[in-house]
Amino acid sequence: SDLCQGCLAHPCMEVCPKKAITWESGRSTIDQEKCIKCGRCATVCPYNAIVKTERPCAAACGMGAIHSDELGRAEIDYSKCVSCGQCLVNCPFGAIADKGQIYQLIQGFNRGDRIYALVAPAFINQFPTLASTGKLKAALKALGFCDVVEVAIGADLCTVDEAHDFLEEVPGKLNFMATSCCPAWSMMAKTAFPDLAKNISMTMTPMVFTARMMKQADPEARMCFIGPCAAKKLEASRRT
């Protein structure tokens, strides 16, 4: 950085194993083509002039799924990605976007499809001082939804089902049981801790419970989940 003081010792040049640092115009310059990002130069610089910068998206990713390609652009490794959405909300440039389905929803309204709004429990606090639960439900119906259903119902069904599984499996067959409510968590556990995958409950998520319940009541209707979790989109796209 511009903090380089042009010291006579040049410790950064001495410790670089790839000779990637040269002396130009009175200060040290790093050749990015040779640099292997080992960090030795930053460690020995007495003026803290060498700073390691990290992409906000990569720093936010707990799975290490984001790296730089040969052109220095951020690239997502989908074999590690769990669709948690942290890179999306932490990118200061809006360069990462999830797949929107607003167009398909509008098409459904225009066709006259019966579409239920399945709202996550978090909706109740989205506009705490501006709109009550009743107003939010009325607004969704005014948009074209035939009815509004709270996914909290599915959460209750999920709890009961998981409780039955727990009583049958623990501690006789399993030493513990992990919840399956969060699709991002389930993917992370199966990817990072494959030996513990068997301990994850096979119970459906609250969203799936609610959607199936409504499908049984109204087979011709379509379901639209509304919630803050990006991983739900990946979950909804699966055929299970």
Locations of the language-model features?
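Glycine-centered loop/turn motif at secondary-structure junctions
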Residues: 20, 49, 65, 95, ...
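Residue-level recognition of alpha-helix initiation/capping sites
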Residues: 7, 36, 52, 82, ...
